Amino acid sequence: MGKRINKKAKEGKETFFGIYQKKFELLELGTKKHLRDEKSDRGSFVPIEICGDSVYLSEPDGKLIPDDHGQQKCDFLLYCSDLPQTCFMELKGANISSKSRYNPYDQIMDTVRFLQKDEILRNLVNSDVEKHAFIVSPGRQKIPKGIETKKRQLWQLMVQNGKEKKKIYDLIHYVKVTK
């Protein structure tokens, strides 16, 4: 069973994320924010609004997950401990690429696998947690030929050991951001 954050943890008396506590930001109900990827060519972004309590934001790419050789990471991770639910967000400055180092499916899958291996962070992705992937880009989402298997692999990782099996389009979301 996944750990739940209690009131003491919210007040800072206990640390739910252990040594990773400083890598997570607690967002208040009603908070509006633009999540921005400064590394992308176009500085891609997505606006979010927090609609619940106990929502935490982290940046796996460069902050939460160390820059090990070959380790790919998604840009943002949102965790709501009340549901529990984890959302992985990959912001793209262009359409989805079939290149292995740049496709969002691999980046999100590697992030999930890293979390599964970590003693403290595995609670973000265990079987009790509903997981969603958001792939954000400014253009129309055209999925390159030959990458369908990556999409299916990501979906399988999202529903792995889950109580309720969901369809692929319920867990992988494509977002087009317009200015």
Task: Give residue spans per PLM region.
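Short acidic, S/G/P-rich loop/turn micro-motifs used as interaction or catalytic elements
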Residues: 64-68, 94-98, 140-144
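Histone-fold modules and their flanking histone-like tails across chromatin and transcription assemblies
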Residues: 63-83
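Mg2+/Mn2+-dependent nuclease catalytic core
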Residues: 94-115
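Conserved catalytic cores of phosphodiester-cleaving nucleases, focusing on short active-site segments
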Residues: 76-78, 85-94
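Short, surface-exposed loop/strand segments
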Residues: 29, 50-51, 69-72, 97, ...
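Domain-level recognition of nuclease-like catalytic cores that cleave nucleotide substrates
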Residues: 2-16, 123-179
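Acidic-basic catalytic patches of nuclease active cores, encompassing PD-(D/E)XK
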Residues: 1-65
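Amphipathic protein-protein interaction modules
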Residues: 108, 112-115, 119-129
